[in-house]
Each structure stands twice: as structure tokens, then as C-alpha cells.
Amino acid sequence: MFARLVPRLQPQLLSKRVLTARYPMLTTTPIYHQTPMQIIKRNYVIVHRERKKEPVIRYLFYMLVASWVAIYFVANRVDKKKPPQQSFTEREFQSYEEETGLKRRNKLISHTMNSKYKFYVIPYVHDEEELKKVANLLQHKDENATVKIIDPAQLIEEQKKDEGMKYHYLLEDLDEQGRPYPPGLITAVIKQEIYKILNTREGTFDTNFIIKNYPQTTNEAIKFENDISDIQKCLILHYDMLNELPKNKTDEEQRAIKNVDGYFDSVGKSKTLVEKFDPMDKEFEEIMLEDI
């Protein structure tokens, strides 16, 4: 019986040898020592091959990249749907200055130059004659220095007319869109003008600067003293503030200008000039005596 069974089992024996060669642990008994039942039984052994596991880290990395790409496209679509910005915050304007190279890192006029260049500001003046009177008094009291009047409104108009000026396109865009000027813009324009003066022959002389209708917010006042120079005195023209300011400014603008007076008064730099009952010459003389 065994002799008849062996030819039939030769294919199985051959496959068993191959399987045993690849997996030596499957059998420890030589084939010729095994009984026919053992040989038949061993042919039914199923060998399970280990499946290679997909790297989990690589899968997570792919998912993370896909998520970033999806977020990027969604964010871009949301930005495109945003309405145009209606105003600049002070921080946004500072970013604009840094990106366009318009911002200077240091104060324009250091403390050591405060005796050479002095700055007097008038938050609100309506009567040009009063402005000239202030300039004449200042010239009379400090004959060794020249007097220079700076009008921010005039500087803004010059920027708008000249395409080569630094703030021309910004001002043009703001006006076309009906947007208010961002905090610090007027101070930046004044700073540019003062810088230009300092780099001319005019800047070699001792100079008393009078800045007309400036500052009209405390933010502008603080920015001026941070970026340009200290302010010597804030001059308040009593008559114009009392009678002309309500006629020409909104309630909010009036509060802002009066807050400027309060700001400088808190640091001892505000002086009210009352011409009707107290001669301005005497008041201004007191200012100059305090400064000497």
C-alpha cells in the first residue's frame, strides 16, 4: 500500500521540502522518517505571512500637509470676500511706515539739540493775525533765533500735488475712498518737513518752530514727542478756543482738542493766552522768562 501511495505523494513531498527549506521550524523530523499520515497531515499546515504595516507617522504627515493646504485656500477665499478697510489703526500705519521705509528708528531731534530747535504748538487758531502776533512776540523775546511757522494743512496739500513725495499715493487713496487719515500720518508729514529744513542752510540756525492747528489729538502729541522732539509749550488762544472752535468743529473734535490742552497742562507745558483782559505781550513774556 505504501509503495502505491508514494508516487502519488511525490508532488506533496517536493513542495514540503521547499516549504521546509524556507521555514525550517515547521518540521524537525526528516521526511523519510515520517509516516504517510504525518506527511498527509503536514501538507495541510497553513503558513500565515506577516503583512507589512503602513508607517503611521508618514500617514499622519500626509494628512497634516493636506489640512494645511485646505486651510490656506479657505483663508484666501475669506480674505477676498472681506470689505475694503475703512480706516487705519496706529499699529497698521506703523507697519506701513516700516514696509515702505518711511519710519526712522530714532527721535529726529535728540535732547542735546533741544536748546537749538524749540517747538511751540497751537492746537487751534482761527485768526491769522493772532498767529502773526505770537510769531512776532517770540521773535522779539529770542532775537538770536529765527521763527518758522509750519502749517500741516499746507504740507498735506503739497503732498497731494506732488507725485514724487512719499505720502502722495497714500493720501490720494485715502481721499478717493473717503477714509479718515490714520493716527500719526499728519505727524509723519510734519516730520518729513522738519527733516528737510534741518538738511538745508536754514537748519544751521537756532530756530523756534510754531506749528499751527496742531496737535488736535493726544495721540498726535505723544507721537510728535516720541518721533520728532520735545514740545516747549502748548499755546492756547483763549478767544479762538472759546468762540471760534464751536463754530468750526464737531463736538467730538472739540473734545479731542481740549484733551490736548489737558494733556500738556498735566505736564506743565500748557499756557493760555488771554488777549482781551490780560495783554498777550505780558503773558507771552512770562512764557519766555520761564523758558530761559
Swiss-Prot record:
Listed InterPro entries: P-loop_NTPase
TM helices/strands, residue ranges: 56-75
Keyword Chaperone assigned: no
Primary location recorded for the protein, binned into one broad class: mitochondrion
Family statement: Belongs to the AIM36 family.
Name of the protein in its database record: Altered inheritance of mitochondria protein 36, mitochondrial
Compartments where located: Mitochondrion membrane
Annotated GO CC locations: mitochondrial membrane; plasma membrane
Span of the transit peptide along the chain: 1-26
Membrane topology field: Single-pass membrane protein
Keyword check for Flavoprotein: no
Assigned keywords, A-Z: Membrane, Mitochondrion, Transit peptide, Transmembrane, Transmembrane helix
